[in-house]
């Protein structure tokens, strides 16, 4: 399985190239300023960790003879860094988020697709994420961030 950027509500981001979104929310919840290392219009695919686990469990249950491919892309939602910022500001009014692109890291992200085609996984083993962008923020990520920081 080829995963998009995986986000867990229960672990802290660890400085990965796709961690700018979660880093924004953690900073906003702590009333800390955050300078995002990619451009505001940067868009890539993300997925909630429970959906990543679900995909692995689904795939392992498919009889081998029913699979026509060796590699499957899976996707959940694609969002820009600016949209992450907007969600952070909406959830934590007064959040101080700016954009200060790092050329090296921006170059890495620019080499990735904005979204991925997971049609093979959807067709061959009925892949479908539980978390779209709204459910990810409203039902998974933000409740845990608020709980972690007492907000």
Give the predicted meaning of each segment:
Residues 1-43, 49-51:
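NAD(P)-dependent short-chain dehydrogenase/reductase
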Residues 37-39, 45-151:
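C-terminal substrate-binding subdomain of Rossmann-fold SDR/epimerase-dehydratase oxidoreductases
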